[in-house]
Amino acid sequence: MTKLDFKAVLKQHHTVRLHQTAQDWKQAIQLCIHPLIAAKLVQPAYFDDILKSVAQYGPYFIIAENVAMPHAQNNGTVQQNCFSLVTLKEPVYFDNDPRPVRLLIGLAATSAAIHTTEALPQIAALVEDTQVVKDLLDCCDETSLFAVIDRVNLHKYLT
């Protein structure tokens, strides 16, 4: 089994924020990354790294309908492999991209290997079902959120 467990990380580090309000996509990313900074899992510069990546590549981390996974390469700013999860009351839109985003799953990985072999497979399993995404967006508290996550086999794509 993986050493990086999506649900366990969210619970252990208290990195879930539900029904947040963001004026724009930058504030949405800030809401998503701030819990990781507050828990000292990433340095504040990690947020800047994500903004630089968006400026260079566009919103490459919109991965499903209503879902973005803000992350960037570790440039020495990631202290520990971690996740955050934020839902928004209203969608945000990235510049020149018509896709709405209401669920943000923050990811910070210490290495590319962790990113591709442990983190991404769990997130893919979580968001591949649009009903699960809808149910996550409807959650009013962490108990209901974790109950939705428990319905998903997060390890099905792990090798």
Curated annotation (Swiss-Prot):
<dbReference type="GO" id="GO:0016301">
    <property type="term" value="F:kinase activity"/>
</dbReference>
<dbReference type="Pfam" id="PF00359">
    <property type="entry name" value="PTS_EIIA_2"/>
</dbReference>
<keyword id="KW-0808">Transferase</keyword>
<comment type="function">
    <text>The phosphoenolpyruvate-dependent sugar phosphotransferase system (sugar PTS), a major carbohydrate active transport system, catalyzes the phosphorylation of incoming sugar substrates concomitantly with their translocation across the cell membrane. The enzyme II UlaABC PTS system is involved in ascorbate transport.</text>
</comment>
<dbReference type="InterPro" id="IPR051351">
    <property type="entry name" value="Ascorbate-PTS_EIIA_comp"/>
</dbReference>
<feature type="active site" description="Tele-phosphohistidine intermediate">
    <location>
        <position position="71"/>
    </location>
</feature>
<dbReference type="InterPro" id="IPR016152">
    <property type="entry name" value="PTrfase/Anion_transptr"/>
</dbReference>
<keyword id="KW-0418">Kinase</keyword>
<dbReference type="GO" id="GO:0009401">
    <property type="term" value="P:phosphoenolpyruvate-dependent sugar phosphotransferase system"/>
</dbReference>
<keyword id="KW-0598">Phosphotransferase system</keyword>
<dbReference type="InterPro" id="IPR002178">
    <property type="entry name" value="PTS_EIIA_type-2_dom"/>
</dbReference>
<protein>
    <recommendedName>
        <fullName>Ascorbate-specific PTS system EIIA component</fullName>
    </recommendedName>
</protein>
<keyword id="KW-0813">Transport</keyword>
<keyword id="KW-0963">Cytoplasm</keyword>
<keyword id="KW-0597">Phosphoprotein</keyword>
<dbReference type="GO" id="GO:0005737">
    <property type="term" value="C:cytoplasm"/>
</dbReference>
<feature type="modified residue" description="Phosphohistidine">
    <location>
        <position position="71"/>
    </location>
</feature>
<feature type="domain" description="PTS EIIA type-2">
    <location>
        <begin position="9"/>
        <end position="152"/>
    </location>
</feature>
